[in-house]
């Protein structure tokens, strides 16, 4: 399915103007029984269930901030830890199963007009259920729009707190599919030193595998013009599903997130 540049521009403009719904805010604080860690990578350790992965790759990503890099903030970040889970049960998805650990202080120095506000939004979200934009806070920064979020819940990990939700990112008004949706956790350590970002592919039995087919009853133009209505219908259908119908289950991914320890 092809989308014209003019339709993409209209989609992005509409997303900026209207954003995602903020009627439902995460108010439930969930603390999980922590499994003993069996993976350590730099300053992070956690329990990796064999059902979620059989190996991992640990990398220290060097800082990207030189003057010859475009100033757009997607290309600017501090040295940080990046862990990729291997042999994850879902493959060929938009996001790989990964964890990022960002040092907040250095990141804020590099992006003083972006990061402090994002950190403030996340803190306000987990403490009071409010934030400064239609999108829930998310790292790593990507040049796409957060199409929706569901199952948003404030959760703890060992030494920190954050928000878990299921979402999708898109650069155009494309159909929502299992190729694109992710479970994500965005949190801060209690001492404020680190931002913990987790992205894990997830799938629902009611979504198509790919996003290359128009939803029934839609044309490219009608999907753009009625995209908010389409997204709301998908949100309603997904929220009506039993959490255990997702794969991997939300509970199994929550258990994974709850086992994370940073810098201890």
Predicted regions and their residues:
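Positively charged n-region of N-terminal signal peptides that target proteins for export
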Residues: 1-6
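C-terminal motif of bacterial Sec signal peptides marking the signal peptidase cleavage site
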Residues: 17-19
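Bacterial signal peptide processing site
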Residues: 21-23
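N-terminal "mature-domain start" segment
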Residues: 28-159, 252-264
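Surface-exposed amphipathic alpha-helical segments
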Residues: 32-44, 198-264
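Signature of long, low-cysteine stretches enriched in small and polar/charged residues
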Residues: 128-193, 199-208
């Amino acid at each position: 399915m092809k989308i014209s540049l003019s339709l993409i521009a209209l989609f992005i403009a509409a997303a900026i103007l209207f954003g995602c719904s903020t009627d439902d805010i995460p108010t439930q604080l969930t603390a999980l029984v922590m499994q003993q860690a069996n993976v350590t990578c730099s300053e992070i350790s956690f329990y990796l269930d064999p059902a979620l992965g059989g190996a991992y790759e640990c990398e220290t990503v060097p800082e990207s901030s030189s003057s010859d890099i475009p100033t757009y903030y997607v290309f600017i970040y501090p040295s940080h830890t990046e862990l990729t889970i291997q042999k994850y049960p879902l493959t060929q998805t938009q996001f790989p199963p990964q964890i990022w650990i960002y040092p907040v202080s250095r990141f804020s120095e590099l992006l003083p007009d972006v990061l402090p506000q994002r950190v403030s939004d996340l803190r306000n979200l987990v403490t009071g259920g409010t934030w400064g934009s239609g999108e829930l806070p998310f790292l790593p920064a990507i040049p796409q729009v957060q199409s929706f979020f569901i199952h948003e819940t404030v959760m703890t990990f060992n030494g920190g707190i954050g928000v878990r939700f299921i979402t999708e990112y898109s650069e155009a008004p494309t159909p929502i599919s299992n190729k694109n949706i992710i479970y994500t956790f965005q949190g801060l350590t209690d001492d404020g030193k680190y931002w913990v970002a987790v992205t894990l592919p997830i799938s629902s039995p009611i979504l198509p595998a790919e996003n290359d087919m128009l939803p029934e009853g839609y044309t490219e133009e009608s999907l753009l013009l009625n995209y908010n209505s389409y997204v709301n219908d998908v949100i309603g259908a997904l929220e009506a599903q039993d959490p255990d119908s997702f794969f991997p289950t939300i509970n199994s991914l929550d258990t994974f997130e709850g086992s994370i320890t940073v810098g201890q």
